[in-house]
Regions:
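C-terminal lobe and adjacent flexible extensions of AdoMet/dcAdoMet transferase-like proteins
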Residues: 219-270
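A short acidic, Gly/Pro-enriched loop at the edge of an enzyme's catalytic core
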Residues: 109-117
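Class I SAM-dependent methyltransferase "Motif I" SAM/SAH-binding loop
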Residues: 56-60
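A short glycine-rich, Lys/Arg-flanked "PGG" loop and its adjoining helix->strand segment in the class I
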Residues: 135-147
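Conserved class I S-adenosyl-L-methionine
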Residues: 1-50
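Class I SAM-dependent methyltransferase SAM/SAH-binding core
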Residues: 61-107
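SAM-dependent methyltransferase
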Residues: 155-228
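Conserved beta-strand signature within the Rossmann-like core of class I S-adenosyl-L-methionine
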Residues: 148-155
Length: 270
């Protein structure tokens, strides 16, 4: 089997929606169940069908899963390949779905206060490297929510006192395609509040193997820094924290004892 190595870039992973989708496929059912459990646990006046927004929706795997549950789902992503892939998979739901190109820090919606639920998982929020952009994004999410609506954000925290390099690996297969995804994170640069990230996808299909690498930086957050950020958004209240096991019964404190955190934020009522 021949192997071709692709040049590294900042977008390679996202320019290949199928392979990106395969990497995260195993999370979809767990995340869907968790969102329903979170609404039951923390929501009010949701009814059976909700209007949901997913910032940075990627390949649309969660949009599809939630649409299959009868919800109206909207999402955006800044990568046009991901948007096109998501639109194609959601065609069968017609008017109950909407996907468009946009960015986390300055996205536009048709009507403020119209969403019941917003979710942004897999640490996507850390792509915003500047504090002002993180604040702007949270404010836009708050404005998009109705009073009492929920916003769930999942991200990795950084403990600057215990900050080694990290490595994760995923393997998945679909329709004769095998994807091995490996992700490395370097120790955080504390002053800059960034960590260098590298993902290598080894893709095997039709007797050939190729490698695609993606390089980027994440913004880092300690628990204290995340609390400070949330304190700037007066319209959102932190009601609970969970982790990437997606168990509604397993709550976490917002501290540096655990790296994976899911924030459950509620839009305050006036």
């Amino acid at each position: 089997m021949s192997t071709a190595v692709a040049l590294s870039s900042s977008t390679a992973w996202y320019d290949s929606p199928l392979y990106y989708d395969m990497v995260y496929e195993d999370y979809t059912k767990r995340e869907t169940r968790f969102l329903h459990a979170a609404v039951k646990e923390y929501g009010k006046d949701f009814g059976e069908s909700w209007k949901i927004l997913e910032p940075a929706c990627g390949s649309g795997r969660l949009l599809e899963s939630l649409a299959e549950c009868g919800h109206t789902v909207h999402g955006f992503d800044r990568n046009r390949n991901q948007v096109a892939y998501a639109k194609k998979r959601l065609k069968k739901f017609s008017s109950k779905t909407k996907v468009w190109e946009d960015s986390l820090q300055d996205f536009k919606i048709t009507k403020s206060g119209s969403y019941d639920l917003i979710h942004c998982f897999v640490t996507t929020f850390k792509y915003l490297l500047k504090e002002k952009d993180a604040v702007a994004s949270l404010r836009l999410m708050s404005e998009a929510l109705r009073p009492g609506g929920l916003c769930l954000i999942g991200l990795h925290l950084t403990n600057y006192k215990d900050n080694p390099a990290d490595y994760e690996k995923w393997v998945n297969r679909r329709d004769g395609v095998k994807v091995v995804s490996e992700t490395w994170s370097e120790p955080a640069k504390i002053k800059q509040r960034t960590e260098a990230m590298r993902t290598r996808m080894t893709i095997s299909e039709k007797g050939k193997t190729r490698v695609e690498e993606t390089l980027w930086d994440f913004r880092t957050y300690s628990a204290k820094e995340l609390k400070s950020l949330l304190g700037k958004i007066k319209t959102l209240e932190l009601v609970a924290c969970h982790d990437f096991h997606y168990s509604i019964r397993q709550k976490r404190k917002l501290n540096d004892a655990y790296t994976d955190i899911i924030l459950v934020l509620k839009k305050k009522t006036k």
